[in-house]
Amino acid sequence: MTSVRVAWFVLMLALVPNISAAQVHDVLCRAGNSSFEASFRTGVTVSIGPQKDSEFSTRACQGTLSWGKQKLVIASGIPLLDLDMFGVDLSPGAPVAAFTTAKSNDACCMTYQTYSLNERPRLLRTITGGGFFEAADTDLDGDVEIWTDDSGAVDGFEGLALGEIDSVPTYVLRLDHNRLLDASSEFRGFFDDVIKRVRARVNPDLLRDFKASDGRLQASPDSPALELIRLNKLRAVKIQALEVVWAYLYSGREKEAWQSLAEMWPAGDQERIREKILKARARGIHAQLDGVSKGKLIKHRKPIFSQPEVKPATAILMRVYPPEGQEGPLDRKEIHIELVVDSAGKVRSVKPAGDTKLLEQYVQVSASRWKFIPAFKNDRSVASRMHTAISPLQ
């Protein structure tokens, strides 16, 4: 059995400050703003909340795992702390908890740590260098992937800030008996969508001008204003070219990556940038890998159980985000929804239920960020359907 105590949000959901739809990752504790506690059937309890200074809460987060009279501090005194998984089976009989931490609001990257939830928890794996981490049973086939990006490798690449890059190279990882495997090539459809989206934004005239440049696009101290404007426009094309190359390279298609580089990069600079791309990747998450996932030729979906068949999923994080540009209060009417929550505790689908006939986009965007302790059947984490109602507050 898993018992849960959640502060700030249960089924009546607090309306949090507006966040852009492009920002799809939320964290449980930000500057000590919320608390969560849950216990697993093995007797291990997770607690996340504001760090205490004497009797007062601080604007920092702390997370612990405790069992019996013992306690293990996962992190303390940090601005960001998230519980990404709790009770999730990465392999049969091996339930884990996973935490995402950041030591600074301004730092590029986060750290992801998985802990066993056996009677005496222990650290299993640490992954560093991602701008986010999110575990999901993406195909509902029972295999859990960890989605992240290689922010640490490309931050400052060619003088670029992460905020300038729309599509930071993505990794899809899998932990198999504690071996960290690259499963990105199994999700080429995702990378193809990135490539299609980036190519659609490329201006052919600017691409031609960029290919006629030196590729470095470095301004001199006495560059006139018009030249600076021109270089800035070419810089956008340069980023787009890198995004296409990265998408092919990180999805296991090196040949296509270099073909795209030849099509989109100045000929005289291709050897330099190719070597630099490979060096940057080598010092990122790639350096932490134990191999490449072989994958399955044919993926078979696992059953999605209804609530009477399982111990139901329970909420870790269920915040509601108002529509962008929302000025007045939202309708206070209760919204009934049916969710499919995968075996990693992430929402795979949301649709109206009961008296609710249509879902506004903000409900779907909000649901995509929710996290749950998954449902359990025979002590295994499984995908399930659940009905719930949300009531956005003014």
What are these regions (language model features)?
Residues 7-18:
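Bacterial N-terminal signal peptides
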Residues 21-45, 49-53, 148-294:
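Acidic, small-residue rich beta-repeat scaffolds with periodic aromatic anchors
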Residues 56-59, 105-110, 161-168:
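Short, solvent-exposed loop/turn segments at conserved positions within beta-propeller repeat blades
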Residues 61-90, 95-108:
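Active-site acidic/histidine clusters and adjacent loop/turn architecture
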Residues 62-77, 113-128, 172-182:
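Surface-exposed loop/turn elements that mediate protein-protein interactions on large endomembrane-trafficking
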Residues 80-87, 129-137:
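Repeated scaffold domains used in trafficking and secretory/extracellular systems
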Residues 88-99, 137-147, 154, 379:
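Acidic, glycine-anchored loop motifs typical of Ca2+
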Residues 287-394:
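Charge-biased low-complexity segments
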